[in-house]
Amino acid sequence: YDKIVDAAWRNGEPGIVFIDRLNRDNVVPSQGRIESTNPCGEQPLLPYEACNLGSINLACFFVPGHEHDEDPAAAGIDWDGLKQVVHLAVRFLDNVIDASRFPLERIDETVRRNRKIGLGVMGFADLLFQLGIPYDSEAGIALAERIMGFINAEGHAASARLAEERGPFPAYAESVFPQRGEGPYRNATVTTIAPTGTLSIIGGCSSGVEPLFALCFTRNI
């Protein structure tokens, strides 16, 4: 274990996945066991399954002038705008499933049966800078929970609305959601947070929910 930790500290490898833990949260166990994740590890997947990912740049929702408020995030974040973008993004990612073409018929069938999407965020560290909240603070942790709780709730609300329009994902009746009294949803999964190493460069923001690794740096693409 010490060697694994030391190697991860030095170069970021190896990544560790506890597959039994992932399967305890498998929302469609009737469709099979989770065997692996996508390359970056944020999206657990069944055999022959794919998931469309998208990330919201949180820094775009900063509202200046509230950095010295007792709760700078209350008025310092455009929550209404964020809600609109979450609902739009869920609809867009669901559309991508229908527009996608896959190399194997089995992949196509699995993807369309579960209709998994993964909406996440980037620019979190930038937003904290804008709000004047230290990344390594209790306030920073609380804001992370607050934002992702909001996105998760609104994302599932958007998926439920799509289920009313287009029908739930085909495996919904065999999923864990009816037992929990949840849904129906259009998508088996809605959120996931990717590291966004490339997307954040395109968006000109910090990656995922990670802190900036330096105050000044140059990245060659």
What spans do the regions from the language model cover?
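Catalytic phosphate/nucleotide-handling subdomain of diverse soluble enzymes
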Residues: 131, 143, 148-155, 200-221
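Internal maturation/activation junctions in enzymes
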Residues: 85-108, 112, 133-196
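Short beta-strand scaffold segments in enzyme catalytic cores
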Residues: 16, 191-192, 201
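A generic hydrophobic-helix recognition signal that picks specific residues
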Residues: 3-5, 40, 189-190
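Short solvent-exposed loop/turn micro-motifs enriched in small/polar/acidic residues
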Residues: 1, 37, 183-186
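Function-dense linear segments that define catalytic or interfacial modules
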Residues: 8-111, 116, 123-131, 205, ...
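Conserved, charged catalytic cores of large soluble enzymes
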Residues: 1-32, 66-72, 121-177
